[in-house]
Amino acid sequence: MAKLEDVYVPIFTSLEPVYGEGSLLQEATRRFDVLKANFNQIFGASPQLFARSPGRVNLIGEHIDYEGYSVLPMAIRQDTIIAIRKCEDQKQQLRIANVNDKYTMCTYLADPDQEIDLQNHKWGHYFICAYKGFHEYAKSKGVNLGSPVGLDVLVDGIVPTGSGLSSSAAFVCSATIAIMAVFGQNFEKKELAQLTCECERHIGTQSGGMDQAISIMAKTGFAELIDFNPVRATDLKLPDGGSFVIAHSLAESQKAVTAAKNYNNRVVECRLASIILGVKLGMEPKEAISKVKTLSDVEGLCVSFAGDHGSSDPLLAVTEYLKEEPYTAEEIEKILEEKLPSILNNDPTSLAVLNAATHFKLHQRAAHVYSEARRVHGFKDTVYSNLSDEVKLKKLGDLMNESHYSCSVLYECSCPELEELVQVCRDNGALGARLTGAGWGGCAVALVKEFGVTQFIATVKEKYYTKRVQKGVVKEEDMELYLFASKPSSGAAIFNF
């Protein structure tokens, strides 16, 4: 029988179950004290409860969750905490404040049906994503939440923004859980993982679900193999003797702002690649357009084709049927016998991609997805193998290096800063290093032998960050936000105290 805290978001009356002891607990205690004091000062009342959700680092399995494939992230200690209270006694407003002065208070109507103004990007929009998504889901479950009421909300997030560590998912997940808890509900974690993934689509990002699933389902001491359809998490104990170091390239990745040319562009390219593979492998164009959504949908056909050639590798079909040269819109429309906007259901997010794109690299995107999916299972199989910990760590590092090459060359989601940072990590003792998160900026993750972590961090700081400190790109006193080691940390929680 599964424990309740494995099924539902746990509710705690103290911080220790999540933050442990020592310096992490001291830091958390200070943050909660500041949140309570600031909440009282801003809103003239105390919060009813708190919710928190962590950021994450993806160890391997990049850009494949939205294609239906398993991924392998772990939660990090950096999180977003939200203090919240219902306001039955005031105008029906959502007042969303932040402990960081950089983010001014946002005010919205307490209306679950309101549209989000995507042309006017505000940090508070992420809370409205959660607000809308929660109400839609509660309604679909037949939960009566009564008439809309105002909410006072104070946010404290320490996941670096634009870092590839899922600051947006940590915010949306903690917001959804805070709203859920203040309305007296507690949905199952697997439901919340799906719900919060849908929430982020309100802000125009076609999220695959990994970031939300790990933020909600993580357990202290374990990475998680996250599977989709249905969402489930399998605990993975990493080999002894290794540690993960996370390093920010200092190039910020604004996923929601650049989506049409970067993140959402790749989603569309993968969809088009999968439909063309379906057609080339025997489906009628109309059938493929209506039934094929992801590359995992046509993997069976690709494997069957490979089987006829003495293999089980879906990449054979990619090599045979998708040309390496970029496709034009006209070439794709000729193969599929339909216009691209119609193929993509005239979806506004996809139309924005079509307006921004001049060509589509279908071969490269499909090759990345199928090879990266295989690497995830290679990572899992290595962890479960009978090899020595030292050999396991070497193999895991090799897989991380292969993953970065694929992300950089086939998926083209790296940037010059990430390339430099990954090389610095490898040149100075990392067993493996790769970009993590959506890419186009953000962080790299390096696998390092535990006994060498302190020296590794000092060397990377000297070789990559010192010149950037001198140029004023980053402050010396903020370095621990941008370069740190992390153990697998705890997932989402509710606090009542």
Annotate each language-model stretch with its function.
Residues 75-78, 165-185, 448-449:
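DPxDG-like acidic metal-binding loop motif
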Residues 131-132, 136-159:
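Glycine- and acidic-rich phosphate- and metal-coordinating loops
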Residues 137-148, 179-195, 450-463, 467-472:
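Phosphate-handling active-site elements
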